Structure formats: C-alpha cells, structure tokens
Amino acid sequence: MLTVALLALLCASASGNAIQARSSSYSGEYGGGGGKRFSHSGNQLDGPITALRVRVNTYYIVGLQVRYGKVWSDYVGGRNGDLEEIFLHPGESVIQVSGKYKWYLKKLVFVTDKGRYLSFGKDSGTSFNAVPLHPNTVLRFISGRSGSLIDAIGLHWDVYPSSCSRC
C-alpha cells in the first residue's frame, strides 16, 4: 500500500512539473566573434525596458545603453558617433528585434507591441530577426560582446513583470 501511495505521489509531482508553462527564451548571439562579454541580466530586476540609447557612426552600432524601470544600465561600446535616445510609452514592450551584422553590429530595429519601429544604424550586412519562442513574452534584457563597437548582441525574452515598485 505504501508503495502505491509513493508511486501516485511521484506521478502527480512529475505531471505537475510537466504542465508548468515555460516563458523564457533566448535569441542570438548575432554579430562577430570579438569584444568583451556583457550582460544586463541583473538589470531586469529594476523593471521592464523603458528606454534605449544607441550610439551609431557611419557604418556600425557603436554603443548601447538600456533603461530598466527608472535605472540606466552601464553603457557598453565605444564613444565615437551620434547618440540616439528613445523612450517607450508606459506599458509598451519590445516584442521583436531585427538587424544586420558582419564582423560588428550594423543595424538594430526594435519593434514594440504598440506598432512602433525604432530603427538605428545602416542597412547592410547579414540579416537577423529575433522573436520570443513563447507567447505573451517580451524583451527583458540584452547581452553580447563589445569593444570600441558592439561586436554582437543576444536577446533574452520573458513575461512582462507583473509589478514593479521602482518603475
């Protein structure tokens, strides 16, 4: 009898784990092989992505900075080029990222759930298009490699935070 009870408990536990929905996914890494690794994984604890700063020059994406909630991440990349800054509307999220690269990142296009296309950089190179694997998930943070330019980018998707006291 004890064996039957333990077996039933084990099966119930296994089936409960099997039906838990997965929500996180990863796209990338898009770009070349150089640069020093960076990750904003800890920044997502400050809240959802609320703004983007992208530095561009004639040919490449030079640098990136992302605002999570009300807190800006560390800047990654170089200092030469024009800095562009775009704020998301309250409750707006990035649901797709496309772009182009060769040895370095050349173009980024962030698409939001409000239908906005936020485009940075030049239209040349190998194309990529990244979307989350799971429904109802959004861009939560970025990672990649950088030096004097953005060498590569990775995109991390998950559910929009249900609450954010610092947003």
From Swiss-Prot:
This protein's name: Zymogen granule membrane protein 16
Family as reported in the entry's similarity comment: Belongs to the jacalin lectin family.
Gene label: ZG16
GO molecular function, one term: peptidoglycan binding
A Pfam family recorded for this sequence: Jacalin
Main location: secreted
Taxon lineage: Eukaryota, Metazoa, Chordata, Craniata, Vertebrata
Organism listed in the record: Homo sapiens
Biological function: May play a role in protein trafficking. May act as a linker molecule between the submembranous matrix on the luminal side of zymogen granule membrane (ZGM) and aggregated secretory proteins during granule formation in the TGN.
Jacalin-type lectin domain ranges (all copies): 24-159
